[in-house]
């Protein structure tokens, strides 16, 4: 484990706090006037229990960064509420629940390459590619002449994800979607 200064904590980092592994959701610097000193306000989520907490850590304090072993895997298929991945190195299969994946399952198509992070041989998180290409299965038809405003319309993709798209995007077309924000990037 590596100790890092509180000022080096970044969103997405995994840190050990109170003998548990936490994922940093938000992190910002807070300066309290007078002799109060400076702090890092850190919002983090327990990766096992799913609980969230806010901690104020003095900037001069050090925290343990959790050792994470990344493994390249491929999403194979969905079986009920479980998603089956295959390790690219040893071809072992891993089943992860929909709850574990939270909102990430809406970006998964068969043969999508992902990085699964492990801590002490236990899966603790999935890192998706920066963007994915999905097919629109349902959206409102394009209204001719409705170009005066730059409005967006909802579109449902093949995975069930709802994305706001420009009016010119039609049902059956493929679009690129940002996996971090869920936003439309471009039509393919």
Curated annotation (Swiss-Prot):
Involved in peptide bond synthesis. Stimulates efficient translation and peptide-bond synthesis on native or reconstituted 70S ribosomes in vitro. Probably functions indirectly by altering the affinity of the ribosome for aminoacyl-tRNA, thus increasing their reactivity as acceptors for peptidyl transferase. Belongs to the elongation factor P family. Pathway: Protein biosynthesis; polypeptide chain elongation. SUPFAM superfamilies: Nucleic acid-binding proteins, Translation proteins SH3-like domain. GO terms for biological process: peptide biosynthetic process. This is Elongation factor P. PANTHER family: ELONGATION FACTOR P, TRANSLATION ELONGATION FACTOR KOW-LIKE DOMAIN-CONTAINING PROTEIN. The keyword tRNA processing does not apply. Keywords: Cytoplasm, Elongation factor, Protein biosynthesis. GO terms for cellular component: cytoplasm.
């Amino acid at each position: 484990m590596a100790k890092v200064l509180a000022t080096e904590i970044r969103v997405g980092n995994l840190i050990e706090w109170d003998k548990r592994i936490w994922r940093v959701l938000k992190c910002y610097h807070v300066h309290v006037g007078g002799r109060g000193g400076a702090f890092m306000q850190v919002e983090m989520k327990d990766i096992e229990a799913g609980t969230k907490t806010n901690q104020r850590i003095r900037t001069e304090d050090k925290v343990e960064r959790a050792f994470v072993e990344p493994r390249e895997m491929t999403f194979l298929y969905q079986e009920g509420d479980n998603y089956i991945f295959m390790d690219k190195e040893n071809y072992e299969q891993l089943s992860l629940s929909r709850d574990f994946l939270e909102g990430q399952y809406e970006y998964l198509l068969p043969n999508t390459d992902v990085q699964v992070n492990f801590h002490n041989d236990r899966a603790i998180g999935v890192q998706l590619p920066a963007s994915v290409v999905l097919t629109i299965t349902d959206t409102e038809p394009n209204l001719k002449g409705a170009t005066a405003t730059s409005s967006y319309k909802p579109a449902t993709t093949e995975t069930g994800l709802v994305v706001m798209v420009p009016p010119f995007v039609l049902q059956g077309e493929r679009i690129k979607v940002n996996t971090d924000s869920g936003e439309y990037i471009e039509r393919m």
